[in-house]
């Protein structure tokens, strides 16, 4: 037996992490993460991890050419690189993620992204590979996608595939665009978390980029949303108490504590922990250091639409081309970092219920951009939120919203644009247009 932690002590292990990230408004930044599929340029066949011609070889070549990047190895395999807060990491199916060091300036973030892409394409071009930003691999069957050689991924795969019939698809076939935003206080945490939870059906729907999976056209919309809804319900979606009057940082901590961490990564060999909760397993830790390690893991192995760490991670958008992705980042900055906009959003979504959010997700799944949610159509939500966001941005950053405005005014989403291009010229040419290569206009 380890130390007997009180409920309050367990909560504090988590709330200390969240509160440790609080910053003054004048220092708030935005941090984008873009996940890509590595594909063969000619065939658009997916490139997997193993070997010198795989994603592993791409990272190894990158490290040889850029020795100032710090490598991360797992069980002898290179799985990540980091430099000055920018990183290149891999998702379980070798989706390649670029995380950009946060900045107040979206223009600086675009330049950072372009610099990483330029360095990657020095390697990819001779190999005949490209990076493609789309929410779900349109072709490759699940069984043809090996996981990275990490024992923890095997444990996650085994556990979550028992909880949801699309868990294996989540790990192997999906790709996202995520944005991290700063928080200033407990009150700011609660207001941002609630607003973002309420906005989640809107962002899932308007950034849907998936017309096909495993070679079959999809009748329903919002494929990534539905994959997450059928992965492991206790660790996905939104915490059930988010719209309760007394929701707090402690409430979020309680939700994390009630979730099984799947395995224990601290203090030696990784071992599976089944359905035991983080709260239960904390009682077996001997030291504060071991408990903090376990809590850090527990906060990372939940996958809600909005995940709290030292920042809030917004996880409800498909991977999409940069013009739309950075439009989304600008949109979120303009909405969340402007006090007038936050007050208006809180008024719009008060009162609110988890069930209403779920119904909104159902409407997006069934009807796409022409679906209806919380008193309006998704397209009107999108255009209205863009207008609000412009009020919270400089004229220069407001221009990043223009591609989204054009998209939604035409009743389009990334999915409908891609489907139309596929119908005209086939998948190979259509996906080449979605290659992540030149992102500076």
Residue ranges of predicted features:
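Conserved phosphate-binding loops in nucleotide/dinucleotide-binding enzymes
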Residues: 108, 184, 188-189, 316-325
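Generic hydrophobic alpha-helical segments
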Residues: 43, 185-186, 203, 321, ...
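Loop-rich catalytic cores of soluble enzymes, especially ATP-dependent carboxylate-amine ligases
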Residues: 103, 125-126, 130-132, 136-307
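Short, aliphatic-rich beta-strand segments
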Residues: 98, 255, 313-315
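Terminal catalytic/cofactor-binding subdomain
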Residues: 1-167, 173, 324, 328-337, ...
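Structured core elements
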Residues: 35-37, 178-180, 313-315
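Long, well-ordered mid-to-C-terminal structural blocks that present hydrophobic/aromatic surfaces
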Residues: 272-356
